[in-house]
């Protein structure tokens, strides 16, 4: 009888240990999904202890922003690592348990099998990122859906679109704010470098003896609908008598552009900020901000709607092709501006006398996308999830996503 009692106690002890082990294991699985790699497996036990010691480990007290990989796994692409206004940006995946946000470029899950097999804490914010237009993603990379980012995998979106959770424009504070700070001095310095070249036989209704040149650098000639359309529009401008210096892969003269002196590059009055997509929401790239504005050139815009440009650009800073019935009408207007320094300088009025809207834009552009993400993350902004990143990203105008070259109404 005594022996039976001892065995009963032993069996109860073993069963209790098994039940406890099962409970601990189930709790572990419910809190996070196990990683595939051994190093991450080892991290889970230590991370579990850290989470217990720290208490609630919300995104607001984690300061790492983990970029899962470089776009297309190309090391020279993507955001830089380092300080991001209170956060630290990194590509080091060992920081995954300590990341408040994990940013995925749309190409980053190409090599991953779903459902997600790596570590994920319920308090982490998973962010979908893109700086490419849907037109390019569909027709250039043949991605017609973002299935791996669907089913509530993503919490926030971070793109150039103003309806993103995190607005990440191409413009950065080093462009617009620096220009406004320098004001008239910046304008005088830039305009002093503009030159004119002789042109004759243009059959214009206004007197002209000299005209400035227009610059365009492009290497995407026919990949997309927008690529083809902008080439045709530029050809029409040249045919109408507008001198345009065209460089890049489309014209087999990349090296010639690199050989231009700094004075030559600064001499252009206008830049063709022609995007490779038409009417994609808010799609304004470095063509507008760096190639034109930063160099003191008036951007001549084709691609984004005029409404979108007015929303994102300084007041009165650009010329839009939609305001002209034909390329010939635009060419005539640009040639006129070259003869009238007062009229040309009006396009820089936003620098000397910025209106309220322009000043508000300048404040907006102080923060880059990752800096804005950090601020939102640390402020513990309410979390949510997107049922479908595909639905968000491809929710565009027919003009934007179509492959048909003719203009679609």
Where are these regions (language model features)?
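Catalytic toxin/effector domains delivered as secreted proteins or via bacterial secretion systems
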Residues: 132-135
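Pol beta-like nucleotidyltransferase catalytic core
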Residues: 2-104, 108-129, 139-141, 147-409
């Amino acid at each position: 009888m005594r022996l039976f009692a001892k065995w009963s106690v032993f069996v109860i002890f073993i069963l209790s240990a098994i039940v406890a082990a099962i409970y601990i294991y189930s709790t572990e699985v419910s809190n996070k999904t196990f990683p595939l790699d051994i190093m991450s497996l080892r991290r889970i036990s230590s991370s579990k202890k850290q989470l217990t010691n720290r208490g609630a480990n919300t995104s607001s007290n984690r300061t790492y922003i983990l970029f899962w990989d470089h776009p297309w796994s190309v090391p020279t692409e993507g955001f830089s690592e380092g300080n991001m206004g209170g956060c630290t940006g990194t590509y080091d995946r060992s920081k995954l348990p300590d990341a408040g946000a994990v940013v995925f470029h749309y190409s980053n899950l190409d090599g991953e099998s779903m459902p997600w097999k790596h570590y994920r804490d319920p308090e982490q914010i998973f962010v979908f990122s893109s700086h490419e237009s849907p037109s390019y993603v569909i027709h250039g990379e043949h991605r017609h859906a973002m299935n791996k980012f669907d089913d509530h995998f993503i919490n926030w979106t971070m793109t150039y679109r103003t309806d993103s959770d995190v607005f990440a424009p191409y413009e950065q504070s080093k462009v617009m704010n620096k220009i406004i700070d320098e004001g008239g001095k910046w304008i005088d310095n830039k305009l002093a470098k503009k030159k004119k070249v002789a042109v004759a036989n243009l059959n214009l209704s206004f007197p002209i003896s000299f005209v400035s040149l227009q610059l365009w650098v492009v290497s995407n000639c026919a990949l997309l609908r927008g690529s083809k359309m902008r080439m045709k529009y530029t050809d029409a401008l040249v045919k109408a008598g507008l001198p345009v210096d065209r460089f890049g892969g489309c014209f087999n003269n990349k090296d010639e552009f690199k050989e231009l002196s700094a004075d030559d590059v600064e001499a252009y009055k206008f830049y063709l900020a022609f995007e490779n997509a038409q009417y994609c929401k808010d799609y304004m790239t470095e063509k507008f901000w760096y190639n034109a504005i930063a160099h003191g050139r008036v951007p001549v815009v084709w691609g984004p709607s005029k409404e979108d440009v007015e929303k994102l650009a300084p007041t009165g800073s650009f010329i839009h092709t939609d305001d002209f019935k034909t390329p010939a009408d635009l060419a005539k207007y640009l040639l006129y501006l070259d003869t009238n320094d007062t009229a040309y300088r009006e396009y820089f009025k936003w620098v000397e006398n910025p209106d309220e809207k322009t000043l508000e834009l300048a404040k907006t552009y102080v923060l880059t996308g990752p800096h804005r993400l950090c601020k939102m993350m640390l402020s513990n902004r309410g979390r949510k999830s997107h049922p479908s990143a595909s639905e968000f990203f491809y929710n565009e105008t027919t003009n934007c996503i179509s492959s048909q070259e003719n203009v679609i109404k």
